[in-house]
Amino acid sequence: MRFMTTAQPVRFATLSLLAWTCLLSGCATPAATEAMIPETASADKTHPYSVNVEVTGGRATDPTGTPQIANDAFDEAITKTLIKTETFAKVKRDKAGNYELSVIIFNVQQPPYGGSASVTMETGWTLTNQLTGEIVWQQALRSTYTASSDSDVSFSGRLTKAMEGVGQNDNKEGVTEFVRCYL
């Protein structure tokens, strides 16, 4: 006959706690492009030129780490917003545009854990005339978004929603600001 030792219930409780922690924290998923495109973005005017977009400073998401905004995803979100708002006559995928919009993600602050997930992102937006090399507009932006505790069961899910929300806010503010410049 085999008897249960006192170590077995402790081991079971520890493994159960670990399993619940993994279930509730979830795996990190990157911010989705479509979720970073603002629904209500609009341009006050349309520029008759072409533009290409380049994003740097983003990071790929490690599934065991925290959600991030990748360069390609944010680049695509900004590009789709420019197309949707008809801010420029044409948005090019290569460096052949009349203007280049460079966006640098230079600071992202995320909470380590918690109920609500508030994310702050700082970016630098620069619009450059490709022919002359002249910087025609430059702006530093700081955006914040909070995903409430009821927006997703897992903290990782809330953090992904917060990353998407902050990306959307920054995208909308950036496009709204630079469309006002005189070209």
Per-region residue spans from a language model:
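A short, structured loop/turn motif at beta-sheet edges
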Residues: 43-47, 91-100, 127-138
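A short beta-strand signature
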Residues: 119-129
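C-terminal/domain-edge helix-coil "capping" segments
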Residues: 27-45, 131, 136-183
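Bacterial N-terminal signal peptides that target proteins for export
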Residues: 2-16
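Extracytoplasmic/secreted envelope proteins and their assembly/folding machinery
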Residues: 71, 75, 79, 85, ...
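A short, hydrophobic beta-strand-centered structural micro-motif
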Residues: 50-54, 86-112
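Bacterial N-terminal signal peptides
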Residues: 13-25
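A structural "domain/chain start" motif
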Residues: 25-80, 85, 179-183
